[in-house]
Swiss-Prot record:
InterPro entries: Caud_bapl16_1st, Caud_bapl16_2nd, Caud_bapl16_3rd, Caud_bapl16_4th, Gp16_dom1_2, Gp16_domD4. This is Baseplate protein gp16. Belongs to the skunalikevirus baseplate protein gp16 family. It comes from the Viruses. The lineage of its organism: Viruses, Duplodnaviria, Heunggongvirae, Uroviricota, Caudoviricetes. One of its GO terms (biological process) is symbiont genome ejection through host cell envelope, long flexible tail mechanism. Its main location: virion.
Amino acid sequence: MLEANVYDNFNPNYYNVSDFSMPNGKKEKRGLPIPKARCQVINYELWETGYLYTSSATLTVSVEVGDIVQILFPEVVPIEEALGKKKKLNLDMVYLVTDVDESNKATLKNYFWAMIESLDVPNAITKTTNFAIIDYLIDPSKNNLMSYGYFFNSSIFAGKATINRKAETSSAHDVAKRIFSKVQFQPTTTIQHAPSETDPRNLLFINFASRNWNRKRITTRVDIKQSVTMDTETIVERSAYNFAVVFVKNKATDDYTDPPKMYIAKNNGDVIDYSTYHGDGTDLPDVRTAKTLFYDRDDHGNPPALSTIKVEISPSTIVTRLIFNQNELLPLYVNDLVDIWYEGKLYSGYIADRVKTEFNDRLIFVESGDKPNVI
C-alpha cells in the first residue's frame, strides 16, 4: 500500500515571494509548507508523466479540489542532471486534485500539465529555441502553480522549435506536447530538500533530465506474457487535405485574376509545386482531396511561403503506441530511448509514460514521428 502527502495548493501568489531569510542573509522564495496530512492510497491508477491520461486514487483522508497530492513510492530513479553528475531521486508523483467523489476517490492531474493549463505562448516565443519556450513555461510569475526551477538536459532539448501557427498565440499545452513529442521526452515533477545543506526549504522541481545525459538506445522485445496492447496516437494534428489550389491576389487588379498554382502532399509528407512533379504517381496519395486557398501578397509583394501552404495540406503524424507490463529483468524508465521488437517488427521510439496500479506496473512506448515509414 502506498502513502501520500497532502498539501494545500501551491499558489504562486503566496510562494513566489522573495522574503525568506537564508542563513547568509539573502532573501529567497518561500519554501513549500509541511504536509497538512499523511495518508494511505488505495484503488489507484497513477501515471508518471500524465501526457495522455488522467490519474485517480482513493485517499484515506479527505481532500479538496485544488489540493496537492504527493504519492510516495519505495523506489528510486536515476538521473544525470549534468554531464558526469549522476544522482538518484526518490520516485514521487505530484498531482493537483481536480475532482473528488463521495467515496473520496480523487481525480488527479499531473503537476506539470496543471501548472501550465490556460497559459498561452506568443508566437514570438514559439519561433525561438526549445530552451526559451520551456523557460517561458516554467515561470511561476505567469502560470498556475509554484515551481523552483528544473533539472534540464540541454543536449536533449538543443535546437530550434519548429511550430507553425496561424494565430498570434498558441496554448502552452499544445506547444509543450509538440516539443516533447519531437525530442521524445516527457517532464516529471519531484519535491525534495533544497540542494544546499544550509537551505532548510523543501522545493518543487520539474525534471527535464533522463537517467543518462547522452541517451543511448536500448533494444528489447515484448511478448504476450507482458499483456501487450497496441494502438495509434496522432502526435501532430494537421489537415484532411492533400492537394491545394492556390490563388494569390493580383496587386494591380486587387483581385484573384492570376492563374492558380497547385501543390500536392506526397506520401512521404513532402509538399511540392505540382507543376514540377515528373514522377509516375505511385508516390502520391491514392485519393486526391483538394482545398482551394486564397492569399494576399505580403508588404513586399511576395506570395505565401511554401511552409504556409504545407500547414494546410500536410497529413497528420500518426504513430504506433505499445502498452505493456514492466520487465523486472530489464527495467525501463520514463524517457528511455528504446527499440522494441514485437511480433516480428521493430519499433523505434521512447518510453513516454508509466502507470502504476495495485496490480501491475505498465509502460507506454510511443514510436518516433520522424521515421520515414510513419503514417
